[in-house]
């Protein structure tokens, strides 16, 4: 199928908001976690497809700051699913030369998640075929507030602040 696609028209970066897994499962009379588990399979297929088409950057908005308002049991199950998925997929990321990055308020995640994500990011940091970015505990508001706090922390003057400088403080900047 990739033969018939004009590679000049393939974007370098694709961002996907992962939404609706729970609702999809409910419509089928299944549990929300059934939907989330199927979402993991969809992520695997999406990553494989992105690699096949030569996408350089794939960002998955996987868990927003709003998701913390869900029932604790669902959050705990999602965090366990995150840990097991990262554990299961790290070797595949390495084998396929895919780098994992994470953006968002990672310190809000359970320590077990932070540890597993850190391990995977360390093991894949030199991979160059594609960068897979997971946005976890992330929102646009969080992104802006985080950048502003870091600018203040670095004691930047009003004269120094420009669009270019501000961009350097965003977690979504290219790296």
Kindly give the residue locations of the regions a language model identified.
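Flexible, compositionally biased loop and terminal segments
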Residues: 1-175
């Amino acid at each position: 199928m990739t033969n018939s696609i004009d590679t000049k028209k393939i974007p370098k970066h694709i961002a996907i908001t992962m939404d609706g897994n729970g609702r999809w499962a409910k419509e089928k009379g299944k549990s929300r976690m059934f939907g989330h588990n199927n979402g993991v399979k969809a992520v695997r297929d999406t990553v494989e497809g992105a690699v096949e088409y030569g996408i350089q950057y794939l960002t998955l908005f996987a868990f927003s700051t709003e998701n913390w308002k869900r029932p604790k049991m669902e959050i705990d199950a999602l965090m366990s699913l995150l840990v097991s998925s990262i554990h299961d997929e790290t070797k595949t990321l390495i084998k396929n030369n895919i780098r994992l990055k994470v953006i968002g308020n990672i310190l809000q995640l359970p320590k077990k998640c932070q540890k597993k994500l850190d391990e995977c990011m360390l093991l894949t940091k030199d991979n160059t075929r594609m960068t897979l970015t997971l946005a976890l505990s992330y929102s646009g508001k969080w992104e802006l507030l985080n950048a502003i706090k870091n600018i203040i922390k670095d004691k930047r003057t009003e004269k120094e602040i420009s669009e270019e400088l501000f961009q350097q403080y965003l977690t979504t900047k290219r790296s």
